[in-house]
A protein has these predicted regions:
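Sec-dependent N-terminal signal peptides
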Residues: 4-12
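Flexible, solvent-exposed loop/hinge segments and secondary-structure transition points
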Residues: 18-140, 147, 151, 155, ...
């Protein structure tokens, strides 16, 4: 009986977490695009030159073969993920006119390095653009104890700008 009770509790909590995560993503998309409803998404298929560009930015392959994006006018929002130290960091980026207008850490699954969620860090990303295909215009400062998470955010910032240029 206790095993069944524990298993039921775990299943219910994982379903609640999934719906909370979906709500966070939807709220980011509506807010960043300035809409009352989440628009239909489109896909960027990671193949050929796009896949090569993604691999150069991430120094690895992206974990999915396609990346979803949501568009409203010249605003494009992406929900992107990267591994921090051990777990995925789920982020939202909105790019407009080749600049990151909005960024947010939606789900942070690690116990340390969580400082990247705060405005003090995120504000370094907002307004950033790319000098060339490799560097951001504004430097993103490191956070002691969160180096891997900061590096992931740098890569995802570059990735969002790169993907925007391919739409």
């Amino acid at each position: 009986k206790i095993k069944i009770l524990i298993l039921s509790f775990l299943i219910l909590n994982s379903a609640a977490f999934a719906s909370d995560e979906r709500l966070l993503k939807d709220n980011f998309l509506k807010s960043s695009l300035g809409l009352s409803e989440v628009p239909m998404h489109s896909y960027i298929i990671l193949k050929d030159d796009i896949e090569d560009g993604v691999e150069k930015i991430l120094k690895d392959t992206y974990h999915l073969p396609v990346i979803k994006y949501w568009k409203s006018g010249n605003k494009v929002s992406f929900i992107l993920e990267a591994i921090g130290k051990h777990e995925f960091i789920t982020t939202g980026f909105m790019v407009e006119d080749n600049k990151i207008s909005d960024a947010k850490v939606l789900v942070y699954r690690v116990n340390y390095g969580f400082e990247i969620k705060y405005d003090m860090f995120i504000n370094q990303i907002k307004g950033n653009s790319m000098k060339d295909s490799k560097k951001l215009v504004k430097r993103i400062a490191n956070i002691s104890g969160a180096t891997l998470s900061v590096n992931s955010m740098r890569k995802l910032s570059k990735l969002s700008l790169y993907l925007y240029s391919k739409i």
